[in-house]
Design a protein with these regions (language model features):
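N-terminal polyanion-binding entry modules of DNA glycosylases/AP lyases
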Residues: 1-111, 175-176, 183-186
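Short, hinge-like loop/turn segments at secondary-structure boundaries
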Residues: 159-160, 177
Length: 189
């Protein structure tokens, strides 16, 4: 497994400029925070990485904390994130998430999958992304790309992303979990 992941990473880094997913970009940013990773992950659903990055940069220039975003007007947020898919729905959702983080978690993003999936709009994939990119906790975020590539590589034989996550968790040593999503997600670019 290490050989496969290392080979894929080397290939992606050989491209000039090297390729990164939007979430890895958020993670590496000087102003990275669990809040920005969570909101960036919500924005990234069904959206190309370059559009997620564009929207996240615009959004976080003005609304970089849960407190600021919780007080935002939906129309103002919509203008900033217009490049992402379903921006009308996501604008309302991320404001709702910011308000919930303040009321339930004191403005902090929980580092627990069970608490994360209780947040509206946060499923296992988003929760696992937050664990990996915000808290560097071993988890396996599985989206449609990771699901498809895992099946094509013969790592799993599953029908649904949730099944893929569980099979990968069984079959891949935990020490590789942090790299799986980012490495396999880059293959589809």
């Amino acid at each position: 497994m290490k050989r496969i992941l290392d080979g894929m990473k080397r290939t992606m880094m050989a491209v000039n400029p090297p390729r990164y997913t939007a979430l890895e970009g958020l993670q590496k940013a000087e102003t990275a925070s669990p809040f920005k990773i969570l909101i960036g992950t919500v924005l990234s659903a069904r959206t190309k990485d370059e559009n997620t990055t564009k929207a996240a940069k615009a959004l976080f220039k003005v609304y970089g904390t849960p407190q600021k975003l919780a007080n935002a007007k939906v129309k103002d947020v919509e203008k900033m994130i217009k490049s992402v898919g379903f921006y009308h729905v996501k604008s309302k959702r991320i404001i709702e998430v910011a308000k919930l983080l303040i009321s339930k978690y004191g403005g902090k993003v929980p580092a627990d999958i069970d608490q994360l999936v209780e947040i509206p709009g946060v499923g296992r994939k988003t929760a696992n992304c937050v664990l990996v990119y915000a808290f560097e906790q071993p988890a396996i975020p599985v989206d449609t790309h990771v699901h498809r590539i895992s099946n094509r590589l013969g790592l799993v034989s599953t029908k649904m992303p949730e099944e893929t996550e569980m099979e990968l968790r069984k079959n891949i040593p935990k020490k590789f979990w942090l790299d799986i999503n980012n490495t396999l997600s880059l293959i589809h670019i």
